[in-house]
Each structure stands twice: as C-alpha cells, then as structure tokens.
Amino acid sequence: MGKDTIADIITSIRNADMNRKGTVRIGSTNITESIVKILLREGFIENVRKHRENTQDFLILTLRHRRNKKESYKTIFNLKRISRPGLRIYSNSQRITRILGGIGIVILSTSRGIMTDREARLKRVGGEILCYIW
C-alpha cells in the first residue's frame, strides 16, 4: 500500500477547519508546496511558513476563519479528493468541470505543473484532477 500525500494534506486541513484550529502542520514536498501556493493565491488560507525540525521540513498553514454572530466560527471551504491512487481521473481542457459556477476551484496535475482549472483552460492543457475546493 502506498501513501497518498495529497489525501493526507486535504484531510489535515479539513479536520483542522472543522475543529476550528488556527494552524495546521503538514509535511513539505514539492506537490504539497504547489497545492499550498494555489490555496494561498486563491485566498483559502491566510499564511504559510516553512519550519524545519531535525532533517524534516514542514509547512505551517494559518487557516482563514470567518466570525459570525450566530456561530463563533464558520468554516470557509470544503475539500474533496477526486483522483486517487486506485482510480485516476483525467480530463482534457474542454471537459474540466466548473465548481459552483466558477466560485470553487479544481486543482489539476498537468504536464506543465500543478495548476487551477482556470489556468489549465487558458493554457489549453488537461491532466489529472487532484481535488475540488469550494
């Protein structure tokens, strides 16, 4: 059985968001750094710091929460893993789905790197659909 790092970071972020934690610590790899850069650029997280313990690198994410009068915290986003090691899902640039009419984003792994659905449509490249975020 292999380790699915993308599912691990999605689960860590989702669990921290549901438990109203302010920060999440995830392992740093090239894939996780690319996904976190997209989340930061799209405004789903507030801040990212790189932390080094012994020989391992970690990313510390500061999540974005919204205060509400009725509820103390409201979760901002939902994450869903689409393509997984047992069942890969691919799409070309014309068939990439729009999440909530363009409000959400799709993160793809293409031949030109990891990017959002909007960037993939502009560059006219398809790839493996990693996750949906809305």
UniProtKB/Swiss-Prot annotation:
Gene Ontology biological-process annotations: translation
Cellular-component GO terms for this entry: chloroplast; ribonucleoprotein complex; ribosome
Keyword Plastid listed: yes
Listed Pfam families: Ribosomal_S8
Coiled coil: none
Nucleotide-binding recorded as keyword: no
Location of this chain's protein in the cell: Plastid, Chloroplast
PROSITE patterns hit by this protein: RIBOSOMAL_S8
Keywords noted in UniProt: Chloroplast, Plastid, Ribonucleoprotein, Ribosomal protein, RNA-binding, rRNA-binding
GO function term, MF aspect, one: structural constituent of ribosome
Record-stated family: Belongs to the universal ribosomal protein uS8 family.
Cited function: One of the primary rRNA binding proteins, it binds directly to 16S rRNA central domain where it helps coordinate assembly of the platform of the 30S subunit.
Description of how the protein assembles with itself and partners: Part of the 30S ribosomal subunit.
Name this polypeptide is given: Small ribosomal subunit protein uS8c
Protein's organism: Aethionema grandiflorum (Persian stone-cress)
Lineage of the species this protein comes from: Eukaryota, Viridiplantae, Streptophyta, Embryophyta, Tracheophyta
Gene symbol of the encoding locus: rps8
